[in-house]
């Protein structure tokens, strides 16, 4: 046999052996996640903003599962606190003012005529929602922006504002009809009953 064939067979045998060992190890030493952490993480807004004091939503979910307060997430607001309270069967408490205030869903807006193209906001964005290049105008992809507010601080010319997120069909806020405000309003059946008496 040729030396090349022997080398190929030897390497194939090694690859097969290492593959089997790695496959066995992945099954034997598999780490199961905590299902309550997954449920808590699913309720958090996934802005990865760090306003809660943790580097992202997953670490905060782990902290909540270990007994930390549920009211440290300003982007989630009261709705998230209520959902977490229902899940964990604890009392819903108001948002902790130390971590900010709930402002509803917001997105970053770059005043493009003032942008100097420094790329500091791009580097700060945890979800790559800002487009631009060095010495070029930057802009925000609204559908990707989580409203974490991390791009505002590093901007040297203060050309980034946080504005309310535009509403679409999925999150449209419809006004409920208001009842008529008249004292002593009578409906037709009441009026007819009163006449018959």
Curated annotation (Swiss-Prot):
Gene Ontology molecular function, alphabetical: 4 iron, 4 sulfur cluster binding; electron transfer activity; metal ion binding
Keywords: 4Fe-4S, Cell inner membrane, Cell membrane, Electron transport, Iron, Iron-sulfur, Membrane, Metal-binding, Repeat, Translocase, Transport
Matches recorded under InterPro entries: 4Fe-4S_dom, 4Fe4S_Fe-S-bd, 4Fe4S_Fe_S_CS, Elect_transpt_cplx_RnfB/RsxB, RnfB/RsxB_Proteobac, RnfB_subfamily
Domain 4Fe-4S: 32-90
Keyword field contains Ligase: no
Predominant localisation class: membrane
Organism domain of life: Bacteria
SUPFAM superfamilies xref list: 4Fe-4S ferredoxins (SSF54862)
NCBIfam families: PRK05113.1, rnfB
Function: Part of a membrane-bound complex that couples electron transfer with translocation of ions across the membrane.
UniProt-listed PANTHER family: ION-TRANSLOCATING OXIDOREDUCTASE COMPLEX SUBUNIT B, OXIDOREDUCTASE
Name of the molecule in the record: Ion-translocating oxidoreductase complex subunit B
Upper lineage: Bacteria, Pseudomonadati, Pseudomonadota, Gammaproteobacteria, Oceanospirillales
